[in-house]
Amino acid sequence: MLQNPELHYLDNAATTIVAPEVADVIDKAMREHWANPSSLYAPGARSEEALNAARAAVARTLGCKSRELYFTSCGSESNNMALLGAALTRRFGKGIVVSGFEHPSVQKPLERLAAMGYDVTVVDPGPDGTLDIDRMLDHVDKNTILVACMMVNNEVGTRNDVERLAAEVKRRNSRTIVHVDAVQAWMRVPIKLANIDTLAVSGHKIHAPKGIGALYLSDSLYQAFQAPYLGGEQEREKRPGTENLPYALGLAAAATRLNKTMKSRDAAVRALNLRLREGLKAFPEVVINSPDNAVPEVLNFSENCIKSETML
């Protein structure tokens, strides 16, 4: 928790404080579920059972099957796994289409793929951060192997219509992989997975600890998907390495907790957002950068006299 009760933390889009009940779940798991989930003896079997329960709980919040949910170390790893895996999986072309305001964990892998000869088309958003979906679709053709777009922008809170984007991409080329970075969207807006092949989420944005995330990988892509990692058979042979069971249980606890209150929280945060917007109008030197239709959890504004890090 905040050591100075007089401070108000305003940077939850960067990271959140771990919820006390989530920390309790992790602490208990570290003491009770110490065995490797892959071990064949009784303590290992109990760990595997707990891991499966955590996977099912997180999957329920996304509306996917348990087997379509893969634990990772963070949202950045989930993005890397999906993007580099897409390039390994689809060999029929070199075309990639991506929005121009993605997280570095999307930008950097695609820069590497561009250096390897892939044709990466970047579609920039408008001045208010709104992305023109039709402009992205204009670049999708028979050679497009991947389209990537974040659901909610982490800087200004713009929400992109990834559901429509995914449906239209599949209509143009059913073999094109559609990846969505939903790190800022999870537990803030409803997520519909129709026509989406891979989707990344992160724990430390929803009051779980840093060091745990997840990747949705659709059943329809599972068999063909070539993961960029090699190693053991964990996570259905797509993400090798002994699973971080305590943090997976923490992620499940955090997701379950927030999933129950998403509608009521949305109403409360919208009221706070509106109150802050109205209050900022009293200061002519303040410029609000987030559009009116941004998610209420993110409000970006500029003020020339105060450094952003001081305000946050």
Task: Identify the residue ranges that each predicted region occupies.
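Pyridoxal 5′-phosphate
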Residues: M1-L312
